[in-house]
């Protein structure tokens, strides 16, 4: 069995598990980013120098000193330069273990979750916990940019193919932002569908929108984690379109109370922090 198979087979994802009511940071499981980056040929030198996996956690709860349950929404930012990504089911199980644990304050919960995730990721992690009264002001918004989804084209292939991007960037130099809501891939372990929207901001030769849309749709039967899909899209665009500047940002729908929104860029980019219609 290969190292990759050994790591993936050890994950709780896709396996029957028991839920615990006692705080247990050992429930968190790491997936080395190196596993997928080796396949992409970017382990030694990533084509991006900025990036993070931005999680929104909708099922965060604990007990205060009086035993009264508290509920909140957490935003977690995991640096893309961390050694590991966090496996999502293990994260859910970990948060469940916090439910019946007493903490002195919201700030203590923030600190403990941030510390535990940092150790698991072997890198920088930031955690911000919001009271529901704060988060209710989050408005539903959309990515800025031009949506490429309304093209009158026939699609007959849903197997991943980077070849759609061949000769996709020719002609004039532009700076533009393109958006698609048709991104769909499948979990690497369970093959459950992952639904997302993707924003691509670039400076370079104008990218053919039909070829780009066909490429994005080809992820429809592709099995890979959210973070890995975004790094694959980024790497493929750099390989075939060769833009001077590039940011790829995806926002996925939630599963199990968690949503993952990765972005990668090769310049000092600041992605929109928004809540989309499907989130």
Swiss-Prot record:
One of its GO terms (molecular function) is preQ1 synthase activity. Pfam families: QueF (PF14489), QueF_N (PF14819). Substrate binds at residues 86-88, 226-227. NADPH binds at residues 88-89, 255-256. SUPFAM superfamilies: Tetrahydrobiopterin biosynthesis enzymes-like. InterPro entries: GTP-CH-I_C/QueF, NADPH_dep_7-cyano-7-deazaG_red, QueF, QueF_N, QueF_type2. The active site is at residues 187, 194. It is found in: Cytoplasm. It is an enzyme of class 1 (oxidoreductase). It comes from the Bacteria. GO terms for biological process: queuosine biosynthetic process; tRNA modification. Keywords: Cytoplasm, NADP, Oxidoreductase, Queuosine biosynthesis. It catalyses: 7-aminomethyl-7-carbaguanine + 2 NADP(+) = 7-cyano-7-deazaguanine + 2 NADPH + 3 H(+). Pathway: tRNA modification; tRNA-queuosine biosynthesis. Belongs to the GTP cyclohydrolase I family. QueF type 2 subfamily. NCBIfam families: QueF. Homodimer. Catalyzes the NADPH-dependent reduction of 7-cyano-7-deazaguanine (preQ0) to 7-aminomethyl-7-deazaguanine (preQ1). This is NADPH-dependent 7-cyano-7-deazaguanine reductase. It comes from Haemophilus ducreyi (strain 35000HP / ATCC 700724). The gene is queF.
